């Protein structure tokens, strides 16, 4: 059985899209998939808790390597991490030498650089994919080793050096195929919803998002009268969710059942998304593309540049420009502005006939309609039959 290598990690954002591609590839082609990630951190846990690993542990294997962080600023830790990167390269070199994979597919993150560099040294084809609107540092480095650079947005090509643009293919951002076929009735059963109110799904991420959680907390008295609020609040913030619930039981007990906090929703995510009338979330690449795959209107609250490199703002602006999202940013992240936006979107009226929401939903579905996981898997399959230089 031929082997392929996937690499990426540091956060789930660099792993979940790769797993979506791995699932699509393995469903149509018999191959062994080895994921090279960080020996420490969340990488192994995410890969080994995936549906693909659970269903076929003989198909998907995880190997950890030393990983040094790539920083854009001065830090004494950079000197230590140089040695970690070097150790990661050496280990990757011998892993690839032994496996002789057909290709190395990178989803970014600092851990992906050593395997891509080692693959280039061994003349193994490298394909890298960027989820965000602007390429991260790891992608910028890996692009120099890559045979092909896959991007989620056509405009991303213009942000790469001119010498690399001929390698770029726009595929969209891969998400699991289940997001295209979520079942609302299963979502309703999982959430135990008996109300006919629209569902407002708040995605704070697996770790939560304090600004977003506080916005919901400060708006909750209004929200529960007009929505069933499904709040993925993060494991570390469940105490806040309980306080919100307890406050409602005292102030508005007849509406308290309309607030449903969860630490993290995993297997049921596609079904809950399909039930939702609108998604309120950060603007990380995976979240916005999963919501788009489900064809949902979005209110995006991106991380500001002080807390990130600005990629979430760029993602949010792209989806707003395409008509699928509205944005709350900076001083606009306030309960009064949030509530006014929901009213402007028509949620106090009959939403079934609301043209604005329908247009936003259609715009979302159109963006993710090509099923990028399948597009990328089909492209990767070409490496099994074509000469490397032809790709």
Curated annotation (Swiss-Prot):
Reactions the enzyme catalyzes = di-trans,octa-cis-undecaprenyl diphospho-N-acetyl-alpha-D-muramoyl-L-alanyl-D-glutamyl-meso-2,6-diaminopimeloyl-D-alanyl-D-alanine + UDP-N-acetyl-alpha-D-glucosamine = di-trans,octa-cis-undecaprenyl diphospho-[N-acetyl-alpha-D-glucosaminyl-(1->4)]-N-acetyl-alpha-D-muramoyl-L-alanyl-D-glutamyl-meso-2,6-diaminopimeloyl-D-alanyl-D-alanine + UDP + H(+)
Q: Where does this protein reside within or beyond the cell?
A: Cell inner membrane
The UniProt record lists the EC number as: 2.4.1.227
Q: Which InterPro entries match?
A: GlcNAc_MurG (IPR006009), Glyco_trans_28_C (IPR007235), GlycoTrans_28_N (IPR004276)
Membrane topology type, per the record? Peripheral membrane protein
GO biological-process terms attached to the record? carbohydrate metabolic process; cell division; cell wall organization; lipid glycosylation; peptidoglycan biosynthetic process; regulation of cell shape
- Keyword Cell cycle belongs to the record: yes
Key words, A-Z: Cell cycle, Cell division, Cell inner membrane, Cell membrane, Cell shape, Cell wall biogenesis/degradation, Glycosyltransferase, Membrane, Peptidoglycan synthesis, Transferase
Please tell me where UDP-N-acetyl-alpha-D-glucosamine binds in this chain.
11-13, 176, 206, 312
Pathway info: Cell wall biogenesis; peptidoglycan biosynthesis
S-S pairs: none
Which terms does the record give in the GO molecular function aspect?
UDP-N-acetyl-D-glucosamine:N-acetylmuramoyl-L-alanyl-D-glutamyl-meso-2,6-diaminopimelyl-D-alanyl-D-alanine-diphosphoundecaprenol 4-beta-N-acetylglucosaminlytransferase activity; undecaprenyldiphospho-muramoylpentapeptide beta-N-acetylglucosaminyltransferase activity
* Function of the protein: Cell wall formation. Catalyzes the transfer of a GlcNAc subunit on undecaprenyl-pyrophosphoryl-MurNAc-pentapeptide (lipid intermediate I) to form undecaprenyl-pyrophosphoryl-MurNAc-(pentapeptide)GlcNAc (lipid intermediate II).
Q: What is this protein called?
A: UDP-N-acetylglucosamine--N-acetylmuramyl-(pentapeptide) pyrophosphoryl-undecaprenol N-acetylglucosamine transferase
- The scientific name of the source species is Treponema denticola (strain ATCC 35405 / DSM 14222 / CIP 103919 / JCM 8153 / KCTC 15104)
Lineage, highest ranks first: Bacteria, Pseudomonadati, Spirochaetota, Spirochaetia, Spirochaetales
What is the gene name? murG
């Amino acid at each position: 059985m031929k082997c392929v290598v996937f690499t990426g990690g540091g956060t789930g954002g660099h792993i979940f899209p790769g797993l979506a591609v791995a699932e699509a590839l393995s469903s149509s082609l018999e191959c062994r998939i080895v994921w090279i990630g960080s020996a420490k951190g969340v990488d192994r846990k995410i890969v080994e808790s995936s549906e693909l690993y659970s269903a076929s542990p003989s198909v998907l294997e995880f190997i950890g390597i030393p990983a040094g962080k790539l920083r854009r600023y001065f830090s004494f830790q950079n000197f230590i991490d140089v040695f970690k990167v070097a150790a990661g390269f050496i280990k990757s070199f011998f892993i690839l030498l032994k496996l002789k994979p057909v290709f190395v597919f990178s989803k970014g993150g600092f851990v992906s650089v050593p395997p891509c560099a080692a693959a280039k040294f061994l003349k193994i084809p490298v394909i890298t994919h960027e989820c965000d609107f602007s390429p991260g540092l790891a992608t910028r480095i890996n692009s120099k080793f890559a045979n092909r650079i896959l991007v989620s947005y056509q405009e991303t090509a213009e942000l790469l050096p001119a010498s690399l643009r001929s390698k770029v293919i726009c595929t969209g951002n891969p998400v699991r195929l289940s997001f295209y076929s979520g079942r609302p009735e299963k979502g309703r059963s999982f959430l135990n919803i008996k109300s006919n109110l629209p569902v407002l799904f708040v995605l704070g991420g697996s770790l939560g998002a304090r600004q977003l959680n506080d916005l919901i907390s400060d708006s909750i008295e209004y929200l529960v009268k007009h929505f069933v609020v499904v709040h993925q609040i993060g494991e570390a913030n469940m105490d806040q969710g309980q306080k919100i619930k307890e406050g409602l039981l005292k102030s508005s007990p007849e509406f308290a059942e309309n607030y449903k906090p969860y630490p993290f929703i995993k297997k049921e995510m596609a079904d809950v998304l399909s039930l939702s009338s609108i998604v309120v979330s950060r603007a990380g690449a995976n979240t916005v593309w999963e919501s788009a795959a489900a064809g949902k209107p979005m209110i995006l609250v991106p991380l500001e540049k002080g807390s990130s490199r600005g990629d979430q703002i760029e993602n949010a602006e792209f989806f707003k420009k395409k008509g699928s999202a509205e944005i709350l940013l900076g001083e606009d992240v306030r309960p009064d502005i949030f509530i006014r936006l929901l009213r402007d979107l028509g949620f106090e009226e009959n939403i079934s006939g609301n043209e604005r929401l329908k247009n936003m939903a259609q715009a979302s579905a159109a963006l993710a309609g090509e099923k990028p996981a399948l597009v990328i898997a089909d492209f990767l399959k070409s490496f099994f039959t074509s000469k490397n230089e032809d790709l």
